Amino acid sequence: MRKIVLAVTALLLVALDQLSKFFVVKYIRLGTIVEFIPNLVSLTYLRNTGAAFSILENQQWLFTVITFIVLGVAFYYLIKQMQTQNFWLLASLLLIISGGLGNFIDRLRLGYVVDMIHLDFVDFAIFNVADSYLSVGVALLIIALWKEEKNGN
């Protein structure tokens, strides 16, 4: 049952990411800024051919290799830890897998990643839902591993 819940959750997360990108591409012109939540969040449709902060632009082969490695390692640990009672560890791996798949789908389908979320209150890169999954997933993974080590596991 746990496998089904995790698989369905991952599919829903990837679907949410892809749906958000679909709406941005359909309804916002490239480079246009649309106020979403005033003074908090704007939507800006960008095509990112690089990684976070557009580093390593146009290196699709590199991102493909890195994505396969990261997804493979995350899947391996998710399967290995499937019976664990550590919710945070499973959640972190699920978010990392979902975020990686969301951006990987873009790279395969479009040749770039659709970014759109712009935080108006801070000078920060424009990102997408999958990037959020990855960031939160990595943060949760660090916390989960730190707690495991602290508990002597």
Swiss-Prot record:
TM stretches of this protein: 59-79, 85-105, 126-146
Compartment(s) of residence: Cell membrane
EC number: 3.4.23.36
Main localization, broad class: membrane
Active site: 115, 131
Membrane topology: Multi-pass membrane protein
Domain of life, source organism: Bacteria
Catalytic activities: Release of signal peptides from bacterial membrane prolipoproteins. Hydrolyzes -Xaa-Yaa-Zaa-|-(S,diacylglyceryl)Cys-, in which Xaa is hydrophobic (preferably Leu), and Yaa (Ala or Ser) and Zaa (Gly or Ala) have small, neutral side chains
Biological process, per Gene Ontology: proteolysis
GO cellular component, one term: plasma membrane
Any one Gene Ontology molecular-function term assigned to this protein's record: aspartic-type endopeptidase activity
The protein's role, per its UniProt record: This protein specifically catalyzes the removal of signal peptides from prolipoproteins.
NCBIfam families: lspA (TIGR00077)
Family the entry assigns: Belongs to the peptidase A8 family.
Name the record gives this protein: Lipoprotein signal peptidase
Name of the gene: lspA
